[in-house]
Curated annotation (Swiss-Prot):
GO terms for biological process: chromatin organization; proteasome-mediated ubiquitin-dependent protein catabolic process; ubiquitin-dependent protein catabolic process. The keyword Ligase does not apply. It comes from Schizosaccharomyces pombe (strain 972 / ATCC 24843) (Fission yeast). InterPro entries: PI31-like (IPR045128), PI31_Prot_C (IPR013886). Pfam families: PI31_Prot_C. Its main location: cytoplasm. Belongs to the proteasome inhibitor PI31 family. It is found in: Cytoplasm; Nucleus. One of its GO terms (molecular function) is endopeptidase inhibitor activity. Keywords: Chromatin regulator, Cytoplasm, Nucleus. One of its GO terms (cellular component) is nucleus. May play a role in the establishment of transcriptional silencing boundaries, preventing the propagation of heterochromatic silencing. Residues 194-265 are annotated as: Disordered. This is Silencing boundary-establishment protein FUB1-like protein.
Length: 265
């Protein structure tokens, strides 16, 4: 039998259908080539019909026959787990088809167990993620275990210098206990509003022509004394006076970055 007729093709389809039922598969429906769906096998079957079954009460399995030369290919697919397999029979083989191995290949015994374990594992992970989130919240703490912001504690001397704390507040408002003579909102007590109190070097120094009064200045290299408020022509000891500053030391008007009082922000 090299070229099966239409009747032969329908006969082989019915043979395949009976073989599937012998494996314990439950017939679900049959889809014809034109898209019609049959709830039972009748004589109106056409070539290339797709038979759908239920295996192990939960797995959806589809079969389809392909005829080529002297062979019949049975294509089987588990649409629930995307497992496929194929069996080949000769057209002149009149023996019954045993498709138990085919069904077992596309529907392994542990398929349901794997699906159940996956569902249980997913549910477990979901429940673990839904635990009280607040129980895992770690309260924000200041550095080194201090309850207050980094710097001076109220009523005590700071263990670490509160660098830039005075820049966060206007003069006389807030700040540390060490005093506050400046801030990001200068008042009329700020030196920029009292040029008469500036030093002679600050007013006349040729090296400060491009530096506005009260601005921060970082030295550009050796011999640059503008950060000390003096120039090379009038050397003086840089640490003279209580308000002497190192080169590059932040001025009272320098802004502190947001969240500077809490390193965890």
């Amino acid at each position: 039998m090299n070229n099966p007729t239409s009747d032969d093709r329908l006969r082989f389809q019915q043979k395949c259908h009976k073989s599937m039922l012998n494996t314990g598969a439950i017939f679900k429906n049959c889809k014809l080539r034109n898209g019609d769906v049959l709830q039972e096998v009748t004589e109106s079957l056409t070539e290339d019909s797709e038979f759908n079954y239920i295996v192990n009460e939960s797995q959806n399995v589809s079969t389809r026959l392909i005829f080529w030369n002297k062979w019949i290919y049975i294509l089987c697919a588990n649409t629930s787990s995307n497992i496929t397999a194929t069996r080949i029979f000769r057209l002149d083989d009149d023996q019954p088809w045993n498709l138990e191995s085919l069904v077992a290949e596309v529907c392994p015994v542990d398929t349901d167990n794997r699906l159940a374990e996956h569902a249980a594992r997913t549910a477990k992970d979901t429940s673990a993620n839904e635990l009280n989130y607040e129980s895992y919240q770690e309260k924000s703490r200041a550095p080194f275990g201090f309850a207050g912001p980094f710097g001076a504690m109220p009523g005590s001397q700071p263990m670490f210098p509160s660098i830039g704390a005075s820049d966060l507040y206007p003069a006389g408002i807030g700040g540390s206990d060490m005093g506050n003579d400046g801030g990001m909102i200068p008042t009329f007590n700020h030196p920029i509003f009292h040029p008469e109190n500036r030093s002679r070097n600050e007013q006349a120094s040729a090296n400060r022509t491009n530096i506005p009064p009260g601005a921060r200045y970082d030295p550009t290299g050796p011999g640059d004394f503008r950060g000390f408020g003096r120039d090379e022509r009038k050397p003086q000891f840089p640490f003279k006076g209580p308000r002497s500053q190192f080169p590059g030391e932040p001025d009272n008007d320098d802004f502190m970055p947001p969240g500077s009082s809490d390193m965890f922000m």
